[in-house]
Amino acid sequence: MAIVKVKPTSPGRRAMVKVVNKDLHQGKPHAALLDTQSSTAGRNNNGRITTRHKGGGHKHHYRIVDFRRTKDGIPAKVERLEYDPNRSANIALVLYADGERRYIIAPKGLTVGQQLMSGSEAPIRAGNTLPIRNIPVGTTIHCIEMLPGKGAQMARSAGTSAMLLAREGVYAQVRLRSGEIRRVHIECRATIGEVGNEEHSLRQIGKAGANRWRGIRPTVRGVAMNPVDHPHGGGEGKTAAGRDPVSPWGTPTKGYRTRSNKRTTTMIVQRRHKR
């Protein structure tokens, strides 16, 4: 993997920094593990914008990634590493001994030809998936389930990981990259190691068009709008917001807590804000 600073042939390319990985597969993805996805452009079923700054972008297929890793006791061989346009992490195509192929999140250090295993008897090695009750305390893990059998939901982005801190009864404590310490049931599964493609954060977009390719539209400041469009809008000439920062709907922003799910609050041992 190499970090390439592009030759400044234009203003848009002058600041561009790319992450090039020669080990990724250059051909087409595995057709049996593709699915179609339509662009919603941030609209719901009523046609109203529910997520701003989305729209356009290049069409791409969804890669069906195995987040459950339930083929216990069946060894798998890594056939190739691939780019996935739907996520920051790379994915790996693995071939199981029974002939089935699946995509998984590629952990750091994974190589073509490497053997992987899942289940309670799997060795403690990067890329193997085990129930948390079988993972030693202090191990770095990723792709962590929040409910047994639901599939991995935490620590799935490029370069992320978590650490298994302790086990108490039927729960284990996991420290996430944000600093939050969370309780997880010991029957939940996790994968050993950290997610690969950690250089993803070092890339520089370089020009606005590169974000448009990704389906990201411009973000307009509230003070540049009219009063009808944003609480910060209006005024003669350049003016400040005139109030504490708020969202377009008047909710305080920059540190204001909006978490409303009280049902799972007991699973958070220490918040990431440490207040």
From Swiss-Prot:
Keyword rRNA-binding attributed: yes
InterPro entries documented for this protein: NA-bd_OB-fold, Rib_uL2_dom2, Ribosomal_uL2, Ribosomal_uL2_bac/org-type, Ribosomal_uL2_C, Ribosomal_uL2_CS, Ribosomal_uL2_dom3, Ribosomal_uL2_RNA-bd_dom
Compositional bias per record (Basic residues), positions renumbered to this chain: 50-59
Molecular function via GO: rRNA binding; structural constituent of ribosome; transferase activity
GO CC aspect terms: large ribosomal subunit
UniProt similarity note: Belongs to the universal ribosomal protein uL2 family.
Complexes and interactors: Part of the 50S ribosomal subunit. Forms a bridge to the 30S subunit in the 70S ribosome.
Function of the protein: One of the primary rRNA binding proteins. Required for association of the 30S and 50S subunits to form the 70S ribosome, for tRNA binding and peptide bond formation. It has been suggested to have peptidyltransferase activity; this is somewhat controversial. Makes several contacts with the 16S rRNA in the 70S ribosome.
NCBIfam families documented for this protein: rplB_bact
Stated name of the protein: Large ribosomal subunit protein uL2
Primary gene name: rplB
